[in-house]
Amino acid sequence: MSLSAAARELSESDFQDIGPAPKPPPVAYNQTKPLVNYMSQMDLGAKSGGKMRAVQRKKSGWVSYKDDGLLSFLWQKRYMVLNDNYLSLYKGDSGREDAVVQIPLTSIVSVSRNQLKQNCFEVVRSSDRSGAPAAGAGGDSSKKSVFIATKTELDLHTWLDSIFSKCPLLSGVSSPTNFTHKVHVGFDPETGSFVGMPFNWEKLLKHSRITGEDWNNNSAAVIQVLQFYQEYNNGTATPTAQAAAQAAGAPGRPPMLTLSSNSSQASMQQIASTPPYSGGEMIPQRKAPTPPKPVVTSGSAIPSAKGGPNVGVTTSPSVHHQNTQHGKQQSPTQSGPPKSLPPLHRDEEGPTAPLGNSVSSVATKESPTERLLNNLSETSLMQKQLPAKPVAPPSSVGPVAPPLRLQPQRVAPGRPAQPGPHAPDTRPGGPNAMKQQHGPPAAASGQLGPDSKKPEGAPGHPTAVAKKKKAGRPTMSNAEIMTRLAAVTFNTDPSPFFQMIEKAGQGASGSVYLAQRLKIPPYDENSGVSQHELNDNIGDKVAIKQMILSKQPRKELIVNEILVMKDSQHKNIVNFLEAYLKTEDDLWVVMEYMEGGSLTDVIENSIGSDASESPMTEPQIAYIVRETCQGLKFLHDKHIIHRDIKSDNVLLDTHGRVKITDFGFCAKLTDKRSKRATMVGTPYWMAPEVVKQREYDEKVDVWSLGIMTIEMLEGEPPYLNEEPLKALYLIATNGTPKLKHPELLSLEIKRFLSVCLCVDVRYRASTEELLHHSFFETSCEPEELANLLKWKK
């Protein structure tokens, strides 16, 4: 029956007898409460639900948990509960305690599997209240990760499904795992730019003057120098950059890096001519090369390179990267183009301030100093185990590793503008190129001619050396360091023993002074220094380096270097005199004073107006190189590599004596470590095997000696006017550098250079062989060096 039909059947009498109204309900019956009292429970962002509520629990169970905070290294067992609003972690399953971690489901932006641990997944949450992912560069900083590991694979998938179904920002599809991303790295001749390069590498290449032709000739070498530059400049290369390096045949790099620049180098030069000091260096740092004149090329700045090689790259996401930074980064004062290159160094040992002096001498018995040095090296140095090679087992001396000096310490002479449409010829095989020695040099010819062989490391034949991961050794405690330091120093205030004449400079770790000895310190029975070790006279001038130990990142290496220098006495090595521990934080190191200054100063002040004229005569060069070679032979006989031979580290005095200084880069070769593979030194003097990060031995010093010879001939080392990145590339690809004016040189010096600068280490001469070379027969007398020091008067 319809409603209208039912209404027609009702009459007016049906509503006359209404009856009494029902009683109202009691007050307790009305349980309605204002809605505002429950608004906080409806807010998903508010921290409610501190206690577990059985009615809200959707899934729970025991898991292992760690976050990216202070305890990121520790996995903790927690009881995890997932409800409609939160993902919560508790210490127990009782339900009575507060949550240790409570993540609103609205803030979870990503959930994905992770290889950090077995059956592990990562929950990424946004710190933004709205939960929306942050845009721009700051997006990563507003996100935090929580890593959760379950007992079984089944539990892992169950938790992933449950979390995905509850999080409003997730689409229900997890992020991909174990994926690869293939990119192509190459050079586009139409646009004149590199394709597929990481952004930071692309920026470096843009200002490095590495051209598309360089890339086509040897892409692996370009990748190698980019990888070196990137890692030593910024700490760690990006995953894409690492993959690009692997695709181009460059050796893989370990993630742990050691960076430092707060070193102090004591060069015993005449103080009156010393420029102001800057940064952490204790000698004036050579300024960057002056930028070359702009070169006009025909059509394009990049040579046409059609069909340039494209390198297939497979990138894989990196799970964990770690950078270890020692000291603060300091940039040298410079005005040239490479101002983005701070003095950095990576080595398996930590950084220290070089004391700038000699290294240990040969002894028939193991002295107490050597015995202490052996114990120090075993406990304080972090070394890589390389394949053993039988050598005479010497006393173990650990290397001392200050920061890598990527800039030389002198201003490069200005070059005239090069007219014409062609760029400077920096490729091997130029008209004046020295013959690149890949085999034994021919003694009959000895001429330095054009290259006849393909440069080592050509594309398609990468010869990367696989490196073992370094094993970290425990460092000494501060108490142990101070105990060992007290054993090799005078534990007294040296102020009454010296008169400070002049301050040479100020660095991050201390100061260098020119001083005059007033008296010999009294014998101290509590000191490990004997009275007969003091070989200086009253009234002599000395160089004193005051070091602040608290500013040294690796104090044990300072102890190691002092021990090395104490055992060094050679006529061609700057001698260590004594050391004083004034306080627990104030160390004074007294060294021999060389009034003639560095060879760099001599070269700079001997350059004439004629660019083709050598700053020094060949007899003078032969004498200086011979004296330096004698000092190197002394070190090499003790299986010690200097690793930073250059004009800055060779000092002269007014009597014509020549001495090597700055042993901050020295390394000891032992029966277990017959070769090294770390890149240290100054790039312009580096041997090709060092730039390519291959294993090397004492012959890297012979290469540097040859470069220093060219430095005395031409006023500067090869490639000094190039950007450091381009210089590294040219060293790696050209090998033996070319001479500017080979027609002006004698046959003897060209033969000498050919055996020093032989790319194949097997045929490169040793210091013993060099000392018998006919070039040294032309050496002048020491008195003839006096003309080189006239500028100091």
Swiss-Prot record:
Keywords: ATP-binding, Kinase, Nucleotide-binding, Serine/threonine-protein kinase, Transferase. InterPro entries: CRIB_dom, CRIB_dom_sf, Kinase-like_dom_sf, PAK3-like, PAK_BD, PH-like_dom_sf, PH_domain, Prot_kinase_dom. One of its GO terms (molecular function) is protein serine kinase activity. SUPFAM superfamilies: PH domain-like, Protein kinase-like (PK-like). Residues 173-186 form the CRIB domain. Its EC number is 2.7.11.1. Residues 8-27, 243-369, 383-476 are annotated as: Disordered. This is Serine/threonine-protein kinase CLA4. Required for hyphal maturation and for septation. It comes from the Eukaryota. GO terms for biological process: cellular response to starvation; intracellular signal transduction; regulation of MAPK cascade. ATP binds at A504, G505, Q506, G507, A508, S509, G510, S511, V512, K545. GO terms for cellular component: cytoplasm. Residues 498-776 form the Protein kinase domain. The active site is at D644 (proton acceptor). It catalyses: L-seryl-[protein] + ATP = O-phospho-L-seryl-[protein] + ADP + H(+); L-threonyl-[protein] + ATP = O-phospho-L-threonyl-[protein] + ADP + H(+). The gene is CLA4. It holds the Pfam family PBD. Residues 258-276, 312-337, 355-369 have a biased composition (Polar residues). PROSITE patterns: CRIB (PS50108), PH_DOMAIN (PS50003), PROTEIN_KINASE_DOM (PS50011), PROTEIN_KINASE_ST (PS00108).
